[in-house]
Amino acid sequence: MQRYPMTPQGHAALEAELKQLKSIDRPRITASIAEAREHGDLKENAEYHAAREQQGFCEARIRDIEAKLGGAQVIDPTTLPKDGRVIFGVSVVIENMDTEEEKQYKIVGDDEADFKAGKISVNSPIARGLIGKSEGDEARIETPKGVVEYEIMKVIYD
């Protein structure tokens, strides 16, 4: 069984999305399909086909979330030893050694990642290059733009 690392907040967000899909979206789509059926010929009924397609997307997302919750490995970074190492769930301040630009990222699960909000996936090239390193260490990270060198300025266990 595949394991899906996630923060407690990410786990709660997936549970909320699953509840929304099952209790609100699924019944709404079912009602739309029933209403579209009443309009007659299903072969040329665009509303019916659109609702069926929407139903397929909804059911696929439900299955995806259920699989992820079933294999969830909830990691609360506040309970981990605070030894200055970069691990899942921490925020890390890094400095690009060429440009001296500082950025802060929180390392989270795949479903929680939001680059614009400063949350990067544990499976991203940046996170993979930082995990296991400590404050003051340098990391050479292969990015789509080439190799970038960063210095780890601070690790925050939040």
UniProtKB/Swiss-Prot annotation:
Pfam families: GreA_GreB (PF01272), GreA_GreB_N (PF03449)
Keywords: DNA-binding, Transcription, Transcription regulation
Single biological process term from Gene Ontology: regulation of DNA-templated transcription elongation
Gene3D superfamilies reported for this sequence: Transcription elongation factor, GreA/GreB, C-terminal domain, Transcription elongation factor, GreA/GreB, N-terminal domain
Source domain of life: Bacteria
GO molecular function terms attached to this record: DNA binding; RNA polymerase binding
UniProt KW Transcription keyword: yes
Similarity comment text for this entry: Belongs to the GreA/GreB family.
Function description: Necessary for efficient RNA polymerase transcription elongation past template-encoded arresting sites. The arresting sites in DNA have the property of trapping a certain fraction of elongating RNA polymerases that pass through, resulting in locked ternary complexes. Cleavage of the nascent transcript by cleavage factors such as GreA or GreB allows the resumption of elongation from the new 3'terminus. GreA releases sequences of 2 to 3 nucleotides.
Protein name: Transcription elongation factor GreA
Organism: Psychrobacter cryohalolentis (strain ATCC BAA-1226 / DSM 17306 / VKM B-2378 / K5)
Encoding gene (name): greA
